[in-house]
């Protein structure tokens, strides 16, 4: 459960990301594909090379979903319901992949914002990404 301090940390950190969210989303996806090659199986139609337009576009989608989640941090299930349906019923993404992407998002944010990435912010973002992952996998059976 996200505490008030966690929510404040997440909002403050995400606010500093600003216009770089899509760039960081794409970088985190690239890290995920490199570090966890089995994740590539969900994107057989993508050009997964560094900087590809398809990875950039999907990175922006990831960033947009996380931006929406931050904006609705007190009601993640309703905010992410459509995305949860998509991943559970249509895409059927293995839930472990959300953990992989979450880890790569943390690494990416730490690389770009080391001064803001305190232990408290790290813990808050980790809890937030975990909460988002839980919502996205809540409709799996």
Swiss-Prot record:
Residues found modified as Phosphotyrosine: 24
SUPFAM superfamilies in the record: Globin-like
InterPro entries: Globin (IPR000971), Globin-like_sf (IPR009050), Globin/Proto (IPR012292), Hemoglobin_a-typ (IPR002338), Hemoglobin_oxygen_transport (IPR050056), Hemoglobin_pi (IPR002339)
Keyword Transmembrane helix: no
Residues recorded with modification Phosphoserine: 3, 35, 49, 102, 124, 138
Superkingdom classification of source: Eukaryota
Subunit structure: Heterotetramer of two alpha chains and two beta chains.
Protein name (database record): Hemoglobin subunit alpha
Gene: HBA
